[in-house]
Every structure is written in structure tokens, then in C-alpha cells.
């Protein structure tokens, strides 16, 4: 049974299409109009081994906020759809990923309960490239978590270069999601004593 989620989201601010295959090979076809964000979504696909298509048209003449937020919301909804009833998955996972001087530590619970804990070094430069506001990283994960209905802890204890601080977070999230979404042949049904997630 394929685990594919497809979501289309349209507002007066953005038009978003996302398709994700949880059992993919890391193939990615991504275009949001925000170069660094595209680069981060490629990390999710590559290191999560998710086949990911993202097409976003947004009001970039204002700024990139709506584009990144709505893409993350659609991505979370697509993950939720692809997971189905969550039967047979590992559910919990964690990952540590370094990128030179920066380190990200991520723990995920595919719990049905949206919750984000996020911390990164303070005092980062406000922009990466011309259009990625570094304060959006937390908001991107908040938006994703809200729709995916997962619990996500992201901690960057140290790092100096903003590009590295952000990128190692996306890579670690990808690796943790990959492990948490994997099917475990020993798990029968939903991995919860409640019987539902």
C-alpha cells in the first residue's frame, strides 16, 4: 500500500501544491520562489528519502512569509495524509546532524498531537540570501507540526554561521522523520496503548 499524500492549498496570498511519497528515494521537484527555502526542502527530501514535489506561487512582492508558511502547512497536511492511520510505524525517532561548526538535535513523536519545542543560538544575522528571514525557521516548523500533527523538538546547542545553523536543522528533521515514519514489521496496528494516534 503506497503512502502518498497530495495537498492543494489556495488563498488570496498563495497557491500551493505538495505531493510526498514516504517510501521514496529522495527525488525532489521543488519551486517556491524562495531560493534558500527550496534548498532546505531539498534537504527534507534527500535525507528523509521522501519523494517530494512542491509548487508554490506566492505574494513575494510583499515578502516571503506567506509563501514559506503556507508551503509548510501544505507539507504537514501531505505528511499527515500519507501516514494514514499510522499503523505499523516506529513512531518515535531522533537524529543528530552536524554541519561544520553547527549541530542540530531533533526528536520526533508521530503522536497525533501538534507540539513544537525549538531553540537555536541567539543573535543570528536576520537574513540568509536575499529572501530567507532566519526568524521564519521556527515558524516553518510550527506550521508543519500543526498540520502533520506531530510532536517535534529541535535544539541547536551551538553554531556560528546562519546557513549552517538552519540547514543542519532541516537535515536532522529529515533524518528523524525518516526513521519515525518507517514501518517496523514487529509492530502490529497503531503504536499506542490508546489504539489510535
UniProtKB/Swiss-Prot annotation:
GO molecular function: imidazoleglycerol-phosphate dehydratase activity
Catalytic activity: D-erythro-1-(imidazol-4-yl)glycerol 3-phosphate = 3-(imidazol-4-yl)-2-oxopropyl phosphate + H2O
Top EC category: lyase
Record's keyword terms, sorted: Amino-acid biosynthesis, Cytoplasm, Histidine biosynthesis, Lyase
Database matches in Gene3D superfamilies: Imidazole glycerol phosphate dehydratase, domain 1
Glycoprotein found in the keyword field: no
Protein location: Cytoplasm
Annotated Gene Ontology cellular component terms: cytoplasm
Cited Pfam families: IGPD (PF00475)
Entries under PROSITE patterns matching the protein: IGP_DEHYDRATASE_1, IGP_DEHYDRATASE_2
GO BP terms: L-histidine biosynthetic process
Pathway: Amino-acid biosynthesis; L-histidine biosynthesis; L-histidine from 5-phospho-alpha-D-ribose 1-diphosphate: step 6/9
EC id: 4.2.1.19
Domain of life: Bacteria
CDD domains for this protein: IGPD
HAMAP family attached to this UniProt entry: HisB
Family: Belongs to the imidazoleglycerol-phosphate dehydratase family.
Name of the protein in its database record: Imidazoleglycerol-phosphate dehydratase
Amino acid at each position: 500500500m503506497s503512502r502518498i499524500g497530495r495537498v492543494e492549498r489556495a488563498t488570496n496570498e498563495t497557491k500551493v501544491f505538495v505531493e510526498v511519497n514516504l517510501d521514496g528515494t529522495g527525488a525532489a521537484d521543488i519551486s517556491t520562489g524562495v531560493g534558500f527555502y527550496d534548498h532546505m526542502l531539498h534537504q527534507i527530501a534527500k535525507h528523509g528519502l521522501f519523494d517530494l514535489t512542491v509548487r508554490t506561487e506566492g505574494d513575494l512582492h510583499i515578502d516571503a512569509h506567506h509563501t514559506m508558511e503556507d508551503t509548510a502547512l501544505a507539507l504537514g497536511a501531505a505528511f499527515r495524509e500519507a501516514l494514514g492511520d499510522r499503523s505499523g510505524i516506529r513512531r518515535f525517532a531522533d537524529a543528530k546532524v552536524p554541519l561544520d561548526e553547527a549541530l542540530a538535535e531533533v526528536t520526533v513523536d508521530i503522536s497525533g498531537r501538534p507540539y513544537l519545542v525549538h531553540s537555536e543560538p541567539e543573535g543570528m544575522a536576520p537574513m540568509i540570501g536575499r529572501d530567507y528571514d532566519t526568524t521564519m525557521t521556527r515558524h516553518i516548523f510550527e506550521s508543519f507540526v500543526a498540520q502533520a500533527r506531530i510532536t517535534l523538538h529541535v535544539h541547536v546547542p551551538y553554531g556560528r554561521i546562519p546557513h549552517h545553523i538552519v540547514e543542519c536543522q532541516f537535515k536532522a528533521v529529515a533524518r528523524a522523520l525518516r526513521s519515525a515514519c518507517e514501518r517496523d514489521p514487529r509492530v502490529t496496528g497503531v503504536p499506542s496503548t490508546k489504539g489510535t494516534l
